[in-house]
Structure formats: C-alpha cells, structure tokens
Amino acid sequence: IHEGGHLDNLMTSVVFLVFKNKLIIFTKQKLKFIPELLSNMVLRDANNFMQEVLLKIMQKDFHVMLDDLRGVKEKIDDLDSKISTSGSLRPTFGDLLTLQKYMIALSTTYKANHKALDFIKKNFTTIDDIDFSTKKIIDELYDTSDTMDRIILGYSQYLDNLENMINNMISYQLNMIMKTLTEI
C-alpha cells in the first residue's frame, strides 16, 4: 500500500485480445510474471493455446491477489496495534482511510476477475472437447475467487468497525475536554 497512493495506481488491468489465433496481452504496468510464466509453460494441447494461457495467467493472478490479502492482514494488525498503543491519532486515521481505499480497489479488481472467470467458463464449456483438468482449474479458480470475496468482505467490515471505534474514541476525548473546560 503506497502512502498517499491514488486509487488508479492500486490496480493493474490486463487485457487479452485474440487475433488470427494469436494471443495479445496488454497491461498498463509491466507484470513480471507473465513473460516468465509463458516461457516456462508446457502446453497440454496446442489447439487450446489461448485457453491454457488464460487459465495459467488467471491462476497466477489469483495467487498474487491472495498474497496481497495477506499483506492487508498485516497492515490491519499494525493499525490495530497502533490504535491500542497510541489511541486515535491523525496518522492512524490516515492509515485507516488508506486501507479502506485499498480494500475498495481490491474489491473492484476481484469483481472484474470474477466476471472474466464467468466469461472463460461460459466460452470454454461450449467447447465439446474440454478436458477434465481444465474444468478442475476453472472450479479451483472459482473457489479461490469466492474465498477472496469472503476475506475482503470480512476485512472491510472490520475496518468499518475500527473506523466507528476511532470516531467513538475521538468523541469521548472531545467530551472529556469540554467537561474539563466547563469545570475550569
């Protein structure tokens, strides 16, 4: 999570185009794993090149997103311990807002990936000769996608509760200050 990062910079779009049996991949930022993945890839069936590449990239992409979620968990834990030790300070509130912004970006990305997965499943299942391993990969991707959706929902709810707690702490502190000033 970049300090002061803009929402647009938190996501990387990947566009796949198929033109005359060639797969063209466009990204805003260079994704290091794509060339490495393609150079080490062994095709099961040359006739299903596009399908295999798309599924392989989606698998790797989902793995990267799960790692990102682990990083978010660490950031949430850090924020939680900051609140416990120092109270609701301005930097803590800024960190909370940054995390919430990042959660929005992740949620949007996951929804887009789920739609892409729906498209892939719809188009692959119309192919009569789809093999068992391809179906298995698609099912695993759906399971991973559902898991990420549940995790992101849980983290978002937790951050919302943290925000409420911070607001309550600030309100309490202001009330105590006003009470002290009134007594003076």
Residue ranges and their predicted role:
Residues 1-94, 108-114, 118:
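Extended alpha-helical interaction modules
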